[in-house]
């Protein structure tokens, strides 16, 4: 019996506060979760979202970076009654992606689709090998590699009706690089694999392809390919064969080039495909396996609206913890269009630099654009400054009221005393005596006159004075003063400062009563219980951990 499901976009999936919910409409617009190591993002928001999507009856694809994620999702399916929907894609299962694309598309259109898938394999292999995209000249190598693969797949499909990774490698490595000049070289062409494929395509094809594609294929291999400088041709060959050779042996050959037991459309009927080929167990092959399955699932979901109604109604999800391992250039396009296919994407990572480190710092704008496609962001505790600055800038700026105040108190006291005194005494004693005699003559013309005088005197004077004074004084004074000012100022500032994300959120565990908190941002949201002091589209959510 098929698992029941909800399809109404306004259906409630997850309670975020007493009055706020995550709806299916918001889920199909994408949810991105970011939080540092030990922040509780997996056991908090990650667990809550997984449970909500399983209870809603969705089908989905779960990408796994760590081996414990496989067991975690097995537990999720059991807890929410979806154990019968669970399919483990391990080394015993398979999806022959080339045969799948030809069955899904058919003809020349399938050749192009297979080529696109092969290019994603090359991109995933480069990422796994630590070779970042976005460097100078990458566009040239990408175009030339795609051209080689396109005309290889077309030739093999037309000539034999079947395409394998091994035949692709054999074809491109046996193709002559120059026209024969000796009889021995001409004779060798009769046994050459690549030449035989081109001849069969023209004379006795197993599948018909458009005549223009057939002529383009022959022209490429006989003219353009030979015209490449030897070094350029060798670099293109090395790029293609080094990645596809992985599919000639081991797990990748068994899971993706042999029998098919799993196809993406199974999720549209409610299956939960868990990629039990974790990256940290299978290393580069694990990363390629997860990315390859993700890509063909995305392509199938995008085209699901052309299928029968029973494959169009059920919502599906793509869930990736440690999403930095699985992101590629196609995600931006998928996130732009998947809403119409009822696809809910949940990507979780630690920080922005984890994306940059996997994709290359040259891809910073591409990463920012990719994140902008998610309508809901959940931010857990994070010590990374760039991630926190991104969160703060995403929430934005607004008028902030800041209180200012001043209070002063003072007191003073003064005491003083002064004393003064003076004594003075004055005594004056004096005696004086004068005595004198004299004569004076006055002579006149023709007459003389003579006279004499004398005087004598004795005197004594005495005086005495005595003064005395005293003065006393005392003064005392004091005072107190007090003033208080209070006011507010308005400033344009960040609604949530970046350091808040590294200090204010709970990380679960017994110290936090097993509660994990996170700031939930929704573009255009109007929460009924928004985060105080911020904006209506921000909510402080609390998630309970399972004890």
Regions picked out by a protein language model, each given a short descriptive name:
Residues 2-343, 500-514, 520-531, 542-547:
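P-loop NTPase motor domains
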Residues 492, 531-533:
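Positively charged interface segments
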Residues 31-39, 46-49, 232-241, 246, ...:
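Conserved P-loop NTPase motor cores
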Residues 487-490, 517-521:
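Long, cytosolic, alpha-helical-rich C-terminal regions that act as interaction/scaffolding modules
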Residues 106-109, 163, 362, 382-386, ...:
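Short coil/turn linker and secondary-structure boundary residues
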Residues 427-437, 491, 496-506:
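Positively charged, hydrophobic/aromatic-enriched amphipathic segments
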Residues 68-70, 93-94, 352-356, 386-387, ...:
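Short gly/pro/ser/thr-enriched loop/turn and capping motifs at secondary-structure boundaries
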Residues 70-71, 317-319, 414, 471, ...:
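Beta-rich nucleic-acid/ligand-interaction surfaces
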């Amino acid at each position: 019996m098929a698992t029941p499901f909800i399809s109404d976009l306004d259906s409630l999936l997850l309670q975020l506060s007493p009055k706020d919910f995550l709806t299916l409409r918001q889920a199909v617009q994408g949810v991105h979760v970011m939080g540092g190591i030990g922040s509780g993002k997996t056991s908090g928001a990650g667990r809550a979202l997984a449970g909500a999507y399983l209870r809603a009856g969705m089908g989905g694809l779960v990408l796994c970076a760590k081996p414990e994620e496989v067991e975690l999702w097995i537990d999720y399916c059991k807890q929410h009654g979806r154990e019968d929907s669970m399919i483990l894609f391990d080394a015993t299962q398979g999806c022959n992606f080339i045969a799948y694309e030809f069955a899904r598309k058919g003809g020349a259109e399938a050749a192009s689709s297979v080529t696109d898938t092969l290019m994603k394999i090359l991109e995933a292999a480069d990422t796994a090998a630590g070779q970042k995209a976005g460097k100078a000249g990458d566009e040239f190598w990408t175009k030339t590699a795609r051209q080689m693969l396109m005309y290889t797949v077309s030739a093999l499909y037309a000539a034999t009706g079947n395409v394998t990774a091994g035949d692709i490698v054999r074809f491109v490595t046996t193709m002559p690089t120059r026209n024969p000049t000796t009889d021995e070289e001409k004779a060798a062409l009769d046994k050459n694999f690549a030449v035989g494929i081109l001849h069969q395509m023209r004379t006795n094809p197993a599948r018909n392809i458009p005549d223009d594609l057939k002529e383009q294929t022959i022209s490429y291999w006989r003219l353009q390919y030979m015209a490449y400088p030897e070094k350029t041709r060798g670099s293109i060959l090395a790029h293609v064969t080094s990645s596809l050779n992985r599919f000639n042996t081991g797990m990748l050959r068994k899971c993706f080039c042999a029998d098919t037991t799993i196809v993406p459309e199974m999720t549209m009927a409610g299956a939960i495909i868990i990629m039990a080929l974790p990256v940290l167990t299978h290393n580069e092959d694990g990363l390629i396996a997860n990315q390859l399955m993700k890509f063909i699932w995305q392509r199938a979901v995008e085209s699901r609206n052309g299928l029968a109604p029973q494959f169009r109604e059920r919502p599906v999800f793509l869930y990736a913890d440690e999403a930095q391992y699985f992101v590629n250039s196609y995600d931006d396009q998928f996130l732009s269009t998947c809403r119409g296919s009822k696809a809910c994407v949940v990507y979780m990572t630690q920080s922005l630099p984890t994306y940059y480190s996997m994709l290359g710092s040259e891809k910073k704008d591409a990463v920012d654009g990719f994140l902008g496609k998610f309508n809901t962001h959940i931010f857990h505790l994070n010590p990374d400054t760039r991630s926190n600055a991104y969160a703060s800038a995403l929430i934005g700026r607004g008028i902030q009221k800041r209180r200012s105040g001043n209070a002063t108190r003072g007191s003073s006291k003064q005491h003083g005393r002064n004393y003064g005194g003076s004594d003075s005494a004055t005594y004056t004693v004096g005696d004086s005596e004068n005595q004198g005699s004299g004569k004076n003559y006055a002579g006149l013309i023709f007459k003389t006159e003579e006279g004499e005088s004398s005087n004598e005197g004795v005197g004594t004077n005495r005086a005495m004075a005595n003064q005395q004074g005293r003065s006393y004084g005392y003064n005392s004074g004091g005072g107190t003063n007090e003033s208080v000012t209070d006011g507010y100022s308005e400033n344009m500032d960040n609604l949530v400062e970046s350091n808040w994300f590294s200090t204010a959120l709970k990380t679960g565990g017994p110290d936090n009563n097993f509660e994990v908190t996170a700031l939930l941002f929704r573009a255009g949201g109007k929460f009924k219980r928004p985060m105080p002091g911020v904006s209506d589209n921000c909510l402080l959510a609390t998630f309970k951990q399972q004890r």
